[in-house]
């Protein structure tokens, strides 16, 4: 499946380049595709279902998109961050450092295919420990794309994010909690 949106007057050329392997796809989905419309948590309350055409009330809370599917074990058709290429990659975590200000993840990516060059997107997620605050199973912390890698070639990417990005606001205590 290749999703092609409103590409403009040069879009056909770009699609042809991907289909003929002149350009190798490396994009990732920015949302989750459910197997069924009913798998989306707000599907029952959309106005065309409940008759309220003036207002929409979402009950998703913090569980929007992939956070809902991951946390409640709903198997999507295509996951957030899913993407295909004409080649394959091996991803190895080389180093992780963390202090009170930031987390840094260093990853080595190798094109293990034997025919096509390609780029890969490395995604870093974190999970909060169980606690009194409601939290999704995992959240995206950051991502990075490699340079164009020939078969057998390696690249090291570094994803850095603020430690405070993992905090949540606790309204009861009026404080940021990790």
Stretches found by the model and what they are:
Residues 109-113, 128-130, 163-165:
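Beta-strand elements of well-folded, non-transmembrane domains
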Residues 116-124, 136, 170-172:
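Short, hydrophobic/aromatic beta-strand segments
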Residues 1-119, 125, 151-153, 177-178:
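Secreted, periplasmic, or luminal enzymes acting at the cell surface/secretory milieu
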Residues 132-173:
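Intrinsically disordered, low-complexity Pro/Gly/Ser/Thr-rich segments with frequent PxxP/GP/PP motifs
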């Amino acid at each position: 499946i290749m999703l092609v949106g409103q590409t403009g007057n040069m879009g056909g050329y770009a699609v042809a380049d991907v289909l003929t392997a002149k350009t190798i796809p490396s994009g990732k989905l920015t949302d989750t595709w459910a197997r069924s419309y009913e798998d989306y948590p707000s599907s029952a309350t959309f106005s065309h279902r409940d008759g309220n055409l003036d207002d929409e009330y979402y009950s998703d809370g913090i569980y929007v998109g992939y956070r809902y599917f991951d946390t409640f074990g709903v198997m999507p058709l295509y996951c957030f961050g899913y993407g295909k290429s004409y080649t394959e990659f091996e991803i190895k975590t080389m180093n992780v450092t963390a202090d009170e200000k930031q987390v840094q993840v260093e990853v080595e990516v190798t094109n293990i295919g034997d025919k096509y060059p390609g780029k890969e997107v490395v995604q870093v997620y974190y999970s909060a420990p169980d606690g009194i605050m409601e939290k999704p199973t995992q959240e995206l912390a950051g991502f990075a794309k490699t340079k164009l890698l020939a078969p057998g070639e390696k690249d090291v990417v570094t994803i850095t994010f603020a430690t405070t990005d993992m905090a949540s606001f606790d309204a009861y205590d009026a404080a940021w909690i990790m």
